[in-house]
């Protein structure tokens, strides 16, 4: 198991953000998180990390929660876009608006970027990913890894309907082998 640390968007930064001592993370952090994971995989592949371990580096599963889940989606092949961020972040009366939008809307200037997919990632477990504004529903076919998305019905930060259920409506992602687990509570 590799557990990356993401300076600039780690637990200390989140604590400072919630206390009002810091602004949301720099939009560039949206790109840095998946690149951090790919760099760790490169280190294992090059033999500079976990030396002497037998690791199938070409068959990797990633797991992420919240923003880490967003990074896992990027590593799995979804590409971020500012299309919805540009219009919906300005609408304070949007009925789907939720607390996760604070983070998603802070990514506006960093959203349009090249794919950060890592071909070594074959599966992803993503828990409560803020994704409704950040990814287009049409980007599902670009997923190269199988994704298990887990969301809770009482998650008030990243609510399941707008952030998990709505992006998967239409059946295409589910028809391609991806799965949604909607936990009651």
Which residues does each PLM region occupy?
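Conserved alpha/beta-hydrolase
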Residues: 1-13
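Alpha/beta-hydrolase active-site loop
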Residues: 22-57, 74, 84-102, 110
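Residue in the alpha/beta-hydrolase core beta-strand immediately N-terminal to the catalytic nucleophile
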Residues: 59-61, 123-125
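Gly/Ala-rich beta-loop-alpha elbow adjacent to hydrolase catalytic centers
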Residues: 64-68, 72
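Acidic beta-to-alpha connecting loop that harbors the catalytic carboxylate
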Residues: 67, 130-131, 153-156, 184-185
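Conserved alpha/beta-hydrolase "acid-adjacent" motif
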Residues: 135, 156-163
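Short beta-strand/loop motif that positions the catalytic acidic residue
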Residues: 143, 149-151
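Catalytic histidine neighborhood in serine/cysteine hydrolases
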Residues: 171-185
